[in-house]
Regions:
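Histidine/acidic residue-rich metal-binding segments in metalloenzymes
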Residues: 126, 167-271, 285-295, 306-327
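Active-site mouth loops of central-metabolism enzymes
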Residues: 84-97, 153-170, 199, 220-222
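Divalent metal-coordination and catalytic microenvironments
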Residues: 14, 30, 35, 61, ...
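His/Asp/Glu-enriched, well-ordered alpha-helical/loop segment
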Residues: 216, 294-396, 415
């Protein structure tokens, strides 16, 4: 859980990143008053009133930055290669325990805010409430509750299948009544056995009905898109975020679409490319199957083809970014083979796709927070804002892998007890 603190906590380090991409403040200090940032800047300019109760922590050559914001998680999954179809067969009580375990793991890794992109039944709602009541440790949660899918579509097994304009609009209203913070739409097929990832699922009219209803209530929309037609449909329907953004044709071939990229940039839509979930599936499946003696020539060929497809996707993200498309960091973990607590892998992949280390850090802090609608609450260190902070050894703007070396995590001004000496 979290450790109680004096009214003021003063932490100092070699540098501070505020999450916006501004130059680092050298010889920095962050002053916390309760659950808020009271002051920040050069240590010589940050002062505590005489006689005030203050706890001081000096981290030497480390970096202070905002708590990370993972814009895409599925907390009910174990991250061990279990298919979503099989995850959905578990009892909700077991899934809630799995989700609580994953939430704690993410918090300990430095993620202080997350967007939950689809769970079964009431699991996400229950976990969010449990974290709010401090019954279980976890990041601030932005949830959709359940993704809306066509009958037999990807993730329909989580409990929100709807078809037709009236039915999908009603499903949006139902989820908002239950307490959804945003609406997740499955605009194409995916890994679900009864779906086709290369084809669009919803029509433009159905997508527009969901987006209109969400926007009428002041809520954002995000859509899973693994086909070019689904991306085009979502642009036509004014969806706020395109997830995966894969330009596959119905026959499974990939063709980069400069026309759609230009529209994404012009619309200021966010793209969450989810690169590492694919890399994790390639690397970890190869490792596990080889250890089990089940790495067949056929599977090896499939994994080699997947690696080539990943290279194409990395290049596509680079080209989209160069065209002005806004990129947000969201892991998609612990889906598939992507283990929980490893969000840094996705941030690193964005850097490999052409973002500077500094911009990749922004994509996982202030940028991610803005993309999921909590830009005033998370992802940035500033006076008066929630004191969610991360301290890492080294400088992630020079070496992004420094984000792995977590010294401490602060949530609402309190140091998270991670069981680390």
């Amino acid at each position: 859980m979290t450790q109680p603190s004096a009214r003021f906590t003063l932490i100092t380090a070699a540098r501070l990143l505020d999450g916006t991409g501004a130059a680092a403040v050298e010889q920095a200090a962050l002053l916390i008053d309760g659950d808020r940032v009271a002051d920040l800047g050069r240590a010589s300019h940050v002062h505590v009133a005489d006689g005030a109760s203050v706890e001081r922590r000096d981290y030497g050559a480390a970096t202070i930055l905002p708590g990370l914001v993972d814009a895409h998680t599925h907390l009910v999954a174990p991250g061990d290669g279990t298919l979503g179809d099989d995850v959905a067969r578990e009892d909700d009580d077991i899934l809630l325990l799995q989700a609580a375990k994953n939430a704690r793991t993410l918090l300990h890794s430095g993620v202080t805010t997350l967007r939950e992109n689809g769970a079964k039944g009431k699991v996400a709602f229950s976990l969010r409430e449990g974290v709010r009541r401090q019954l279980a440790p976890g990041p601030r949660m932005v949830i959709c509750g359940r993704p809306i899918a066509i009958t037999g579509g990807h993730m329909g097994y989580f409990g929100s299948e709807a078809d037709g304009e009236a039915a999908v609009r009603a499903e949006v209203r139902k989820l908002l009544k239950e307490g959804a913070d945003y609406i997740k739409i499955v605009a194409s097929g995916g890994s679900t056995r009864t779906s086709d990832p290369n084809r669009a699922s919803y029509t433009v009219a159905e997508l527009a009905a969901m987006t209109d209803e969400a926007h009428r209530h002041g809520k954002l929309t995000a859509a899973h898109c693994t086909s070019a037609q689904s991306v085009q449909n979502c642009l036509d329907a004014d969806v706020d975020m395109v997830i995966h953004c894969i330009f596959n044709e119905p026959d499974g071939t990939y063709r980069f679409r400069p026309d759609l990229v230009a529209r994404l940039a012009a619309a200021r839509a966010w793209v969450n490319p989810t690169l590492y979930v694919m890399k994790a599936g390639i690397e970890r499946q190869r490792e596990v199957r080889e250890r089990e003696g089940r790495l067949t020539p056929e599977l090896t060929a499939q994994l080699d083809a997947a690696r080539r497809a990943l290279d194409v996707r990395v290049d596509a993200v680079r080209r989209m970014s160069e065209a002005g498309v806004r990129m947000t960091a969201g892991s998609d973990s612990p889906w598939g083979w992507y283990a929980p607590g490893e969000f840094v892998h996705e941030i690193h992949m964005l850097a490999q796709a052409g973002l500077s280390y500094a911009d990749a850090v922004v994509a996982g802090t202030a940028g991610a927070a803005e993309s999921i609608g909590v830009g005033t609450l998370a992802g940035r260190l500033a006076r008066g804002r929630p004191a969610d902070a991360l301290v890492v050894r080294g400088d992630p703007t020079r070496d992004i892998t420094a984000l792995w070396d977590v010294l401490d995590v602060y949530q609402a001004g309190r140091r998270v007890e991670r069981g680390v000496a």
